[in-house]
């Protein structure tokens, strides 16, 4: 019973002390902590610990200030809040900061509380007791960001904060400005350098003592071309064209009859000319027997690298003694022309063996490989520049070149391959889709029905650059063989 009386007495004393303190504060112009009708505004900010926080409050408020976290008068970890006689600021603030706040204030200090330590050296409270928004004391905060709103009322004292706030904004988007350097590939364009072949057209015809006429007509694409007839009776005519470095035809002796020498289209020599013996050509040879009713003594020789358009047939009926030979020399192995080597290589790339008479015809057929040279110059540039249009233009030139090959094969009686190559060449030249497909990714590849032909094309380019016409033709023959299979 005595204990209860003592406790009641102590409680009355404490209540009286609190009431006296409140009255004293009111008389001093302060704020009654139990008066909820006071109005005021307050705002504050705090930062630190590498994170940013912001908060603001204005206007009238009543009640208590609340925020995320709690704080006592001395030390808080979270946001500082407390009892407000003037009310709580409308708004909210949250966040955390590392640092310290020290000093004494009877004003409002609402905002973000530090997660460090807070010390107070006054008997007042540091938790937002403000009527007019006045604040005295000092508050310091350190951290890595500064944010918040200042108080709406005057403040006596200092508030300092140290820290830094950094924000990095990334700009995303597409920027295209200024010139760009590098490789620019053109689409829809083609570049080609065409090689022009130089040829001289010259020809001469001379006749020695002869009771007859000798005529020579046609064109000769060569350095020199001469036809000489001596000591013969009758008439001889020569028409056609020859592509060679040098050629000469000589007949000596006596004979009678007539001969027609046609070297354009289908080449035939028929008549009763006195030539008996064997005719041979370097690389391949052919022989013919001569019999007839005329006699001739002497020798006939033919030297050089002729290039004839057509097949050659030699028929004669004469009697007598003599010999004729085909031979000569040039800058190519075995006396072969560029075209002859190319056609031979292409045929060997398609079939296992080539007949000797076909080889002879290839050696003398008049054709051109200019389209092939243009084609692989463009294809080479397309590989280097990753340009699909250049390669496609080169493939069209390849088709044009194959049309020339088909004509040469027809001339040399390779009819079965000639018709197939002609049909294929027409499709390639027209750019028909599906024959050859050009795919551009990191590199360029050429396909036909799933079969990659890139390696074959690059080997052909290498042979073209080194002027290996036999190898160039062989690789093209391999490509054509694959295309003809399907």
UniProtKB/Swiss-Prot annotation:
Main location group:
secreted
GO cellular component terms attached to this protein's record: extracellular region
Region spans: Disordered: 30-332
Tell me which UniProt keywords the record has, alphabetically.
Glycoprotein, Secreted, Signal
Composition bias type Gly residues, residue spans: 41-60
Where does the record say carbohydrate is attached? 37, 73-74, 83, 112, 129, 149, 174
Q: Where is the composition biased (Low complexity)?
A: 61-318
Note whether Metal-binding occurs among the keywords.
no
Q: Does the keyword Secreted apply?
A: yes
Signal peptide region: 1-22
Q: Where in the cell is it found?
A: Secreted
Family label:
Belongs to the Sct family.
What's the protein called, per UniProt? Secreted protein C
Organism name: Dictyostelium discoideum
